[in-house]
Curated annotation (Swiss-Prot):
The lineage of its organism: Bacteria, Bacillati, Bacillota, Bacilli, Lactobacillales. Residues 5-184 form the Guanylate kinase-like domain. It catalyses: GMP + ATP = GDP + ADP. The keyword Kinase applies. This is Guanylate kinase. The gene is gmk. Gene3D superfamilies: Guanylate Kinase phosphate binding domain, P-loop containing nucleotide triphosphate hydrolases. Signal peptide: none annotated. Its EC number is 2.7.4.8. Keywords: ATP-binding, Cytoplasm, Kinase, Nucleotide-binding, Transferase. It is an enzyme of class 2 (transferase). Belongs to the guanylate kinase family. It comes from Streptococcus agalactiae serotype V (strain ATCC BAA-611 / 2603 V/R).
Length: 209
C-alpha cells in the first residue's frame, strides 16, 4: 500500500503572484505532485480555462456543494466564493501522490484545522507598494476593490505565523525554486518517514524469528 501523499497548501495575498509562481513550478517535468484546481464564483478572466485555472461555478452551485459537505475548504472573498473540492484531494492523497493546493488565506487556515500535517507555504510580496503596482497593472479591479485587497493583504500577512514557510516572490523563477526545495525537504522529515522504517524493522524481525 502506498504511503499517503503530502498536502501542500500554497497561499498569500491577492496579487502576490500565486498563480504565476504555481505555473512556473508546474512548467518543468521535475515536479512530483498534482495540482488541485480550486473552485470559484468569480467571473472568468481573459485567458483562463475552466477546469485548468479554476472550476467556475455559479453561486447557487457552489452553495449546494457546501451544504452537501463536498468542499475541503471554502471562503468568501471580495464578494466571491473560493474553495477546494474534497473528493479529488482525498482520492489523490490515498494513492500516495502529493497534492498542491493554491488557495486563499482564509481557506488555508480551514485546511490546517482539518489536515494539520500538511505543508503550509505563504507567498509574500517584497513590499506592499509592489503589491499595489501588481494589482493596478492587472487591470481587472476598480480602485475601490484594489484598496480593499491591500487592506486585506495587511491582515493576511499578519497571519503568516500560522504557516510553516514564507517565500518571497521577488522573482518568479526564484520563488518557484524555493517552493520546490521546501516540498522536497518535507519528504525527508523524520516524523514523516519514521513509520516506514519502523515497519521495515518489524518485518525483518519476523523473517528472522
Amino acid at each position: 500500500m502506498s504511503e499517503r501523499g503530502l498536502l501542500i497548501v500554497f497561499s498569500g495575498p491577492s496579487g502576490v503572484g500565486k498563480g504565476t509562481v504555481r505555473q512556473e513550478i508546474f512548467s518543468t517535468p521535475d515536479h512530483k505532485f498534482d495540482y488541485s484546481v480550486s473552485m470559484t464564483t468569480r467571473p472568468q478572466r481573459p485567458g483562463e480555462v475552466d477546469g485548468v485555472d479554476y472550476f467556475f461555478r455559479t453561486r447557487e452551485e457552489f452553495e449546494a456543494l457546501i451544504k452537501e459537505g463536498q468542499m475541503l475548504e471554502y471562503a468568501e472573498y471580495v464578494g466571491n466564493y473560493y474553495g477546494t473540492p474534497l473528493s479529488y484531494v482525498n482520492e489523490t492523497l490515498d494513492k500516495g501522490i502529493d497534492v498542491f493546493l493554491e488557495i486563499e488565506v482564509q481557506g488555508a487556515l480551514q485546511v490546517k484545522s482539518k489536515v494539520p500535517d500538511g505543508v503550509f507555504i505563504f507567498l509574500t510580496p517584497p513590499d506592499l507598494e509592489e503589491l499595489e503596482e501588481r494589482l493596478v497593472g492587472r487591470g481587472t479591479d476598480s480602485p475601490e476593490v484594489i484598496a480593499q485587497r491591500i487592506e486585506r493583504a495587511k491582515e493576511e500577512i499578519a497571519l503568516m505565523r500560522e504557516y510553516d514557510y514564507a517565500v518571497v516572490n521577488d522573482q518568479v523563477s526564484l520563488a518557484a525554486e524555493r517552493v520546490k526545495r521546501v516540498i522536497e525537504a518535507e519528504h525527508y522529515r523524520v516524523d514523516r518517514v519514521i513509520g516506514r522504517y519502523t515497519n521495515m524493522v518489524k518485518e525483518t524481525d519476523k523473517k528472522l524469528s
